[in-house]
Amino acid sequence: RRFAAAGWSLVLTGRRAERLHALADELCAQARILPLVVDVRDRVAMEQAIEHLPAEFSRLRGLINNAGLALGTAPAPECSLDDWETMVDTNIKGLLYSTRLLLPRLIAHGAGAGIVNLGSIAGNWPYPGSHVYGASKAFVRQFSLNLRCDLQGTGVRVTNLEPGLCESEFSLVRFAGDKAKYDSVYAGAQAIQPADIAETIFWILNQPAHININSLELMPVSQSWNNFAIERA
């Protein structure tokens, strides 16, 4: 919505067709919108979708890799391998597919183009139950830094955005739809809102072409790092 309001042409991707098309219908009065129903985990589907982008959407200035999820909070010995695979497939492989497939278009744009990868403070700071999710976001952080090295001289910028507590469907997915658990995460805390993340991404991609925001950690004032565990005898 933030980018559409500024007149950017947008390619929107998602798995839920009805919801995706509803958003496209909402935004089409403000900007050119192309909704693509695709699962980022499906390499072949991603290849086909990007190969067949209409000409009016072929010139790419920005890529926002925001598909990601966490599943469960159980300690590692109690976790489902299926959940671990889903997190790896989405948070790591999905991001790699979209990035590699769209890099030629970003490089062709040159100065001013940019990639924003949605990392997490979980990739920087460990906490119980984060295991694979946190590790996947640590991967995203390191990949973002390494990608910057490879793209030096192309004009393409790379940013790893690392949000903390954000009130979104993320926790509802993590708790398998348990609304009570979802509500407990945000109770009494003024969490970051998705619109705050969108505003930050908009700011990043609209920096002067000679400026790169390497990484940006974003937390609500109500959150800090003071919950370190100590085992006492």
Q: What are the residue ranges of the model-derived segments?
A:
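Alpha-helical segment proximal to the catalytic Tyr-Lys
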Residues: 104, 145, 149-150
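Residue(s) in the substrate-gating loop at a strand-loop-helix junction
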Residues: 120
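Canonical Rossmann dinucleotide-binding motif of NAD(H)/NADP(H)-dependent dehydrogenases/reductases
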Residues: 1-10
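Substrate-binding pocket helix/loop in short-chain dehydrogenase/reductase
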Residues: 74-76, 80-88
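C-terminal helical subdomain
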Residues: 160-164, 179-227
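Active-site helix of classical SDR
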Residues: 99, 136
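The beta1-alpha1 cofactor-binding region of Rossmann-like NAD(H)/NADP(H)-dependent oxidoreductases
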Residues: 17-18, 37-49, 81
